[in-house]
A protein has these predicted regions:
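Glycine-rich, Arg-bearing micro-motifs that act as flexible, cationic patches
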Residues: 111-133
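Short, flexible loop segments at boundaries between secondary-structure elements
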Residues: 140-148
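A short acidic, glycine-rich active-site loop
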Residues: 56-71
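General small-molecule cofactor/ligand-binding pocket signal
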Residues: 38, 88-92, 143
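Structural beta-alpha unit
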Residues: 1-2, 30, 78-112, 149
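Small/aliphatic-rich secondary-structure junction motif
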Residues: 2-55
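Short, hinge-like loop/turn segments at secondary-structure boundaries
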Residues: 52-56, 106-107, 130-131
Length: 149
């Protein structure tokens, strides 16, 4: 487990996620680990009408989301990741918690560093949070950076 050689840091581009990137960078620098900045493009909710999708191209929309996510990841990489850290970006599609755990497993990551948003209420009780699910699904340690850290 220690030292960490590969760290996956998923981001949703929120302020708490930037804090997780900072923590992941510090750990990657300390352990000379590779850092993978990951963004998961969630499923596109589509409501089909009796007349079809009325010209809505779901595949084109998903490509646009991927392109936008790639650009945002590159910006985060340039802005938050020191040159001393060996880092790369990755965009995948699917349900966030499953994809984060899958990527970490496929990449043979030693650690996942992610943020918590402190969500509460009925959505959290019914669906759970992404960090909680990642902790359940992941095959490696997960470091959750709290909103107030």
């Amino acid at each position: 487990m220690l030292p960490f050689k590969k760290i996956v840091c998923p981001t949703d581009f929120s302020e708490p996620a930037c804090r997780a990137i900072k923590a992941a960078c510090e750990m990657a620098e300390t352990f000379s680990a590779e850092l993978i900045l990951l963004h998961v493009v969630g499923p596109v909710p589509v409501l089909e009408t009796p007349t079809g999708l009325a010209g809505f191209d779901v595949a084109a929309y998903q490509r646009e989301l991927s392109n936008s996510a790639n650009a945002s990841l590159q910006t985060r990489l340039e802005k938050h990741v020191p040159d001393a850290v060996n880092a790369r970006t990755l965009v995948v599609h699917g349900e966030p918690a499953h994809e984060i755990a899958r990527v970490a497993n496929e990449e043979a990551a030693d650690l996942i560093v992610l943020s918590t948003h402190g969500e509460t209420g009925w959505r959290h009780r019914i669906f759970g949070s992404v960090p909680e699910k990642v902790i359940r699904y992941a095959h490696c340690p997960v470091l959750a950076i709290h909103l107030d850290s």
